[in-house]
Structures are given as structure tokens and as C-alpha cells.
């Protein structure tokens, strides 16, 4: 059994242990950085030194280390998270691997993301749900292109807490001057991200030797800060959750019998209390919250991150994909917006092609009208392009076939983030973060040579024959 869990069970008993564990705060973090910076080894070290590995897992790692390990006689702790056969054979991470562990203070979900450039899309997927980014830097190599790329994507995805871990300090003889040099280089780069709200901590460690990961290290006696695990335990993410206006995307209409009709979902931002007046969008109908229902009983209020079922005083038409907000909300409804897009498939993004677009619980249809620029992740310079390639990131104009209530991504990730789905293959091909909402009062000039019938026929063809890749004629008018 996991030795840490076994000890707590012996001290508390099963019921007290489960109760204590249930109410611990949850932190989601990812490890990212360039190839061979030691991301998987760091996670393995965290699990090992915090006594979160079961005996049979450790035995399996010892056995596998003799066959495919890279650490000589010692167990290769990276094998705890590199589970795919290709990953073990090549000694790299390909897919996003998730691991779970807890300490006395907090529960953790770790996303171990790949460092290779061709798997950048996997890194973006892992980062999309995280609160903290642990960015690894090889002390021998310093800040690399992929370090900058992952930092840019993490910032783009709204992660506000960066922990920069300068790894492999044992290979530079635990040099303080080398650490300070890398620290200065990274802080200079971080200023280009133009985010004054970024919380950046920088610390030295050696994942292979276990220096400054869970426990302080004598070899790093010149470093006066906390080891990595303590930094993770003390990151304050509660302030981030409670900010913003109330947003509640409806995921499911719960009607177990004729006497109950509730709307299930997770509070995306802000908070709600019994008696608050809400508006259902897009219908605009108002009501008041009658109950906030959970498995453990009713609540008087709910905050961001809580999964609840809301019942209302009035019977109004609400379905999956609708959005509940407070009546005084100034949420904007639009069918056009600008978004930063990360493209995730071999076939490049081309303006004019239609895709299914999923925002929160709602699915609609849209297209890219124009690509303003692509970002050079290494230099953060912007350049013109006609097509967004695999792993490309760019600012684009997006239009939908219907009006949808949206937020900017920085205000609410759930109602400001979306994915592109290929209409033929159902493959997720891209992800977007809304930056600016367009003013619907801006209208395009009408071309009298195009009849209403032709516009309707064009819309019909685009809806039922997407493989023809017909452009939206209404966007070409004028």
C-alpha cells in the first residue's frame, strides 16, 4: 500500500481520513518545457519522495529501469508517468499523462506534457485546465525556444502562476551564478508576455538527485526559498476562482420525476445564492434561484468550481447549452469575435471553411473570416500569413451562424474558450481563446446583385455539404 496513505489511515481511521481528504483544496498543475529537461523525472521524484507510490508500482519501475531506463543502476522515476510503449522506448513523453496525489495540505492533479515541438497541441490540451505551470529549464542549456513557446501558451491559456524550476543543478555543480544567470534571462523574456498579473517563482533543483523537490538540499544551501512541493502547497488559487461575474453553463436538465426540474452544471465564475435573480440566455427570461441542490444536501450559496443543480421559482424554457447569469450582468451576445487560435491538425486552417464550434455546453457552426497574424513563439513577433499550420498560433476573426452569449477568455475561460471540430471526421482540430467581441451594430454593405434566394441557397449548401468547402457569400458582400 501507499505508505503515506497507510500511515494516515492508521492514525485517523477510514471515515475521518475520507472526510479530511474530501475538503482539501485541489490544485491542477502541469509540467512543461523543452525536450529532456526532466519533466517526467520531476513528477516521479515528487511522487516518490512524498511517499505516494504503491509498493507494486515501485517494483515495476525497478524492473522496467533495467530494461529501458536511462539512469544506470538507479530506478528511472520518469517511467512512473511515461506509460506508452513508444514513450519508454524513445525516452520521451508523447501524450499528456495525468497523475494524482495528495499531501497533508492539498490534493494535486499533475499533467505531464510533452516537450517536443510536434506535440505542442498536446501541451496546450494539458494546460487548458491547470492553475499552475511548472516550467522546467535544463541548467546546462538555459532558456530554449520550447521554453518560450510553452510559457507563451500557458500565459495565453490564462495560467497566472508560473513556477520556473531550474533542473539538473547537479550537472553544473549546483552553481549559484548559473542559476542567477538563467533567472535573469527568463525574467527578461517574461516581460514580453505583457501580463502584469503573472506570479512567477524561480527555484533551483535536481529531480534526479531529489535536491529541493520535496525537501531542502544541503547542496543548494545558498538558496533560501522553499522546496518545490511547499511552493505548490502554498500557491493561492482561491482568489482567482471567486473573481468575475456569475456564469453557469447548463450541462444537463435534471428531471427525475414530475415534481423536480433542475439545471445541472458547474459554476464557471463568480457565485450564486438562493433568492438571486437570474437571466437565462439566449431567451432572456428571468427567474429567481429557489434551491441549490447537491448530493450532500441543499446549499445557500455556490462558488466557482462547484458542481450543483439549480432549481428556479418559475417554469421557463432552459436546455443544455443555455447560460445562466445574474440579471444585472452586462454579458454581450454576438456572432462575431476576434480570438487567439492554436491549430492542432496537419491540414492548415483556411479562412472560409466551416467547422462545428463548441463553447461551454453549446455547439454551433462557424468559420474563420480572416487571419490577422501568426505569432512567432520564439521571438513573440507577429507576421502575416494566409494559413495557420499545425501548432501555429494566430489572431483570427471568427463568425458564427447564430448569436451566442460570450465572454473574453481572460474574464471567464469556460464561456470565452472554444474548440473547432471538423464536420466530416468529428476530430478536434483547433482551440480558441476569445480576445475581443465585435459590435453587432457594425454591418456590412449589401450587394444588390445578390438575391435573398441565393443567400439562402448558399447557407443551405454550406450546412448540408460542408465537404464542398463553399465560402459564406454573406461574408463576401460589398
UniProtKB/Swiss-Prot annotation:
Cited Gene3D superfamilies: P-loop containing nucleotide triphosphate hydrolases (3.40.50.300), Translation factors (2.40.30.10)
HAMAP family recorded: Sulf_adenylyltr_sub1 (MF_00062)
CDD domains found in the cross-reference section: CysN_ATPS, CysN_NodQ_II, CysN_NoDQ_III
Region (G3): 112-115
Region (G2): 91-95
Pathway: Sulfur metabolism; hydrogen sulfide biosynthesis; sulfite from sulfate: step 1/3
Taxonomic lineage of the native organism: Bacteria, Pseudomonadati, Pseudomonadota, Gammaproteobacteria, Vibrionales
Ranges annotated as spanning the membrane: none
Residue numbers spanned by region G4: 167-170
Protein name: Sulfate adenylyltransferase subunit 1
